[in-house]
Amino acid sequence: DSTQALTTAWKEACASASPSTILVPKGNFAVGLITLEGPCKSSIGLQLQGTLKAPADPSKIKGLGWINLNKIDLLTIFGGGVFDGQGKSAWVQNDCHKNGPICKTLSMNLRLYAVTNSILRDVTTLDSKNFHVNVIGCKNLTFERFKISAAETSINTDGIHIGRSDGVNIINTEIKTGDDCISLGDGSKNINITNITCGPGHGISVGSLGRYKNEESVVGIYVKNCTITGSQNGVRIKTWPKSEPGEASEMHFQDITMNSVGTPILIDQGYCPYNQCTAEVPSSVKLSKISFKNIKGTSTTKEAVKLVCSKSFPCNGVELADIDLTYSGKGGPATSVCENIKPTIKGKQIPAICSGSAAKAA
């Protein structure tokens, strides 16, 4: 077990007044729960060439994260190595749909808290028991040439989940998993997601928002040059009905290719998984300044564009331009569904957006 060796190396490197790098060489290293804590005296690197392996038994890790990175400035993680969560046997325990209240919260592969001015590049997170990467309270953080991999059947294995963080960049990254490729929780600000391949999975999502009290607003989400393949959804914004009040604005999705995607464009203000909520009461999360531009490809559902906004707070300032989404299944061609929204439409629109009977009163 290399837990102690890595922890000791970190403490020594963190105490160094000059920049230092910890090398994990090629090979497999069993590692239990680890917390790598700052602040450090200088910049610090973790060069991961080998594979760190989590215990397969989920009960061996107490807490939300397997590898926890806390309060670190100027961190670089690189080297081509792998964080292997060994989650396959644990996923059945993560099925809240089946297990209900006894659904266990399992450990995430990487949990970053208050990490600033840092970069993770050329590493892989594999088979996490829960979310692969959780980013909370971070600032100026970049994921580049980052790779995330888990089976399509894995449960709750969001690729990168971000909350209450400012200035996170995810670029040139490949994500294949069983839940959202990227999910953006409350307090996500100035997030740039560029040149991502996503799928399988549930697409790139803002939310879900409005479930908890005192959520922070979401502002400045930019998703560009992405390819989404074989996922349940494409790009989506989801808020809970009967929600706490909240706001999300300046969310822009552009130049995205959809290959056999469930619902390529989705605003869902009645998001209610497992019917655990009161859907009759509209969402109190205000959505505004949203654009979907140059989004093309194929939908596996007839409703290729679904814009279902809140009756209490209709979506405001939504623009769709150059949409070309086709459906070749039964009852085709593709259609759009619109509720409580009057978007601005420009350029090509396949399917016709919010036309005729599809448009409900805003």
UniProtKB/Swiss-Prot annotation:
Does the UniProt entry include the keyword Kinase?
no
Q: Which tissues express it? A: Pollen tubes growing through the style during pollination.
Family annotation (InterPro entries): Glyco_hydro_28 (IPR000743), PbH1 (IPR006626), Pectin_lyas_fold (IPR012334), Pectin_lyase_fold/virulence (IPR011050)
Q: Which domain of life is it from?
A: Eukaryota
Q: What is its main location?
A: secreted
Entry-listed glycosylation sites: N140, N192, N195, N225
Q: State the name under which the record lists this protein.
A: Exopolygalacturonase
Q: Which organism is it from?
A: Oenothera organensis (Evening primrose)
